[in-house]
């Protein structure tokens, strides 16, 4: 299947976090591609990836990065596709540096920013699916079912309080 979501990350060390976005897309049967695209080590490749994403059929890009975390913003600067930034937790500042770098974009270059780490990657996968579901009723139904299942799990969790 043609990938609809591009998942990019600054290095392989970001995979521990970013795989959770892939898990969500797998669960919802949304096709995606995943690549290491470094804003600092492979800037030309990053520009090419962003500039050609639309013509390759990509509809949403999820970009995960830690530290300076320039990947989401620089990707957004080179495409008008929706870009979702995932701050990867860093050792130095627990991901706060990544979060602030991604969320503080100048007006005119939006990046939808999620929370730090695993929860952020999960939410990025869900947000990408929700964006696509605006044009895909089957995907919208799957998201509704997932939300209902989550609700039931929470309601049933009270039974564990013994």
From Swiss-Prot:
Pathway: Purine metabolism; IMP biosynthesis via de novo pathway; 5-amino-1-(5-phospho-D-ribosyl)imidazole-4-carboxylate from 5-amino-1-(5-phospho-D-ribosyl)imidazole (N5-CAIR route): step 2/2. Keywords: Isomerase, Purine biosynthesis. InterPro entries: PurE_ClassI (IPR033747), PurE_dom (IPR000031), PurE_prokaryotes (IPR024694). It comes from the Bacteria. One of its GO terms (biological process) is 'de novo' IMP biosynthetic process. It is an enzyme of class 5 (isomerase). Substrate binds at residues 11, 14, 41. It catalyses: 5-carboxyamino-1-(5-phospho-D-ribosyl)imidazole + H(+) = 5-amino-1-(5-phospho-D-ribosyl)imidazole-4-carboxylate. Its EC number is 5.4.99.18. SUPFAM superfamilies: N5-CAIR mutase (phosphoribosylaminoimidazole carboxylase, PurE). GO terms for molecular function: 5-(carboxyamino)imidazole ribonucleotide mutase activity. HAMAP family: PurE_classI. NCBIfam families: purE. Belongs to the AIR carboxylase family. Class I subfamily. Catalyzes the conversion of N5-carboxyaminoimidazole ribonucleotide (N5-CAIR) to 4-carboxy-5-aminoimidazole ribonucleotide (CAIR). This is N5-carboxyaminoimidazole ribonucleotide mutase. It comes from Bacillus subtilis (strain 168).
């Amino acid at each position: 299947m043609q990938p609809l979501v591009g998942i990019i990350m600054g290095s392989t060390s970001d995979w521990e976090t970013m795989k959770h976005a892939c898990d969500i897309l797998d669960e919802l049967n949304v096709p995606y591609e995943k690549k290491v695209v470094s804003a600092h080590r492979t800037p030309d490749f990053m520009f090419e990836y962003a500039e050609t994403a639309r013509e390759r059929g990509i509809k949403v890009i999820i970009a995960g990065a830690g530290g300076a975390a320039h990947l989401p913003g620089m990707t957004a600067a080179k495409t008008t596709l929706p870009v979702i930034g995932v701050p990867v937790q860093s050792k130095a500042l627990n991901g706060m540096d990544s979060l602030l770098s991604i969320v503080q974009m100048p007006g005119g270059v939006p990046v939808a920013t999620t929370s730090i780490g695993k929860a952020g990657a999960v939410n990025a996968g869900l947000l990408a699916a929700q964006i696509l579901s605006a044009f895909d009723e089957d995907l919208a139904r799957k998201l509704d079912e997932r939300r209902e299942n989550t609700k039931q799990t929470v309601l049933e969790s009270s039974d564990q309080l013994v």
